[in-house]
Amino acid sequence: MPKRILWIDVIRGISILAMVTFHFAFDLMYFGFAKPDLIYQPDWRLFERMIAFSFLFIAGLSLSITHRSWINWKSFFRRYGVTAICAVLISIVTYILFNNDMIRFGILHAISVSGLVGLLLLKLNSLSLFFLAVLLFLLNLFIPQPLEGDYFWQWLIYTTETPNSLDYRPIIPWITPFILGMASYQLFKKWGLMETSNTTIHNELSILCWLGRNSLVIYLIHQPILFVGFLLFLQLN
């Protein structure tokens, strides 16, 4: 088994488990088993944002881990190419299922574009990256939204022409946690948290590690499985 940083797998596993939980709540609402505004309540909205933050933070940290010393182009295009293709497929499938509420620029789209931007930032030190993240966060706070703008700019920032979407993560502000992840690399390395291991965990954390290592696959298949499960339940009852 290749060496990995186990705590990152654990955090990613917790994040994907949280995402499945959130989507299960969405399905309960969608199929009429919960009140129609369930996931729009403040606590659920916060939960959703925490999940997105964690995925983007880990993605930024992983970019620095893999490419800080030198850019491994083969690894980069394999990882981010697959992510981008999956993002496009999700847009197509959600358009077929939900039409105008399709996912146009969701979490995978944000990770893909942030990865490209991140390549340009790899040589910045941690302090510079941190200040850039803070600047972008403040920019998002002080820019009045939605901005007057057309449909094309929805990938960058929320505009007056941005339609409804089941998952929407525009670059401003959602590149911020990605850059914070990049900025944290040197700090975590200083604290000795970047040590790799090929040790297999044989306790309750092993499931979380497995979920973390297979997070993209789980992300892609969990919602279809949940949907089919709900449809079968409705048919049987």
Label each region the model flagged:
Residues 1-237:
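Alpha-helical transmembrane segments and their immediate juxtamembrane cytosolic regions
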